Amino acid sequence: MELTPREKDKLLLFTAGLLAERRKARGLKLNYPEAVALISAAVMEGARDGKTVAELMSFGRTILTRFDVMDGIAEMIPDIQVEATFPDGTKLVTVHQPIV
């Protein structure tokens, strides 16, 4: 299977998001890379499902709470930017204050 560098990046992010999702389901508090990966993967999947940029900006803030992450992680992530593929092309989605 031949993958472009962009496709490899998306696959790595999705895999990290799955790992974070499993750890969260087991009750573990997520660290910085896990939190970013989980939110980013969810935004990418939402774009694939046909949600709009505005919907994803709001949705991204509902994925994790301060109780889901280790101490201090929420403050380390002021925003997350994800290049997501929508039915009409690739767009940049910015989620401000993703962990509330």
Curated annotation (Swiss-Prot):
Domain of life: Bacteria
Cystine pairs: none
Catalysed reaction equations from the record: urea + 2 H2O + H(+) = hydrogencarbonate + 2 NH4(+)
InterPro entries noted in UniProt: Urease_gamma, Urease_gamma/gamma-beta_su, Urease_gamma_sf, Urease_subunit
GO terms, molecular function: nickel cation binding; urease activity
Sorted UniProt keywords: Cytoplasm, Hydrolase
Class in the EC hierarchy, top level: hydrolase
Primary location: cytoplasm
Localization per Swiss-Prot or TrEMBL: Cytoplasm
Keyword set includes Cytoplasm: yes
Alphabetical list of Pfam families matching this protein: Urease_gamma
SUPFAM superfamilies in the record: Urease, gamma-subunit
Enzyme Commission no: 3.5.1.5
Pathway annotation: Nitrogen metabolism; urea degradation; CO(2) and NH(3) from urea (urease route): step 1/1
Any one of the GO CC terms: cytoplasm
Gene Ontology BP term (one): urea catabolic process
Assembly: Heterotrimer of UreA (gamma), UreB (beta) and UreC (alpha) subunits. Three heterotrimers associate to form the active enzyme.
UniProt cross-references to PANTHER family, sorted A to Z: UREASE
Family under the similarity heading: Belongs to the urease gamma subunit family.
Protein name (record): Urease subunit gamma
Species per Swiss-Prot/TrEMBL record: Albidiferax ferrireducens (strain ATCC BAA-621 / DSM 15236 / T118) (Rhodoferax ferrireducens)
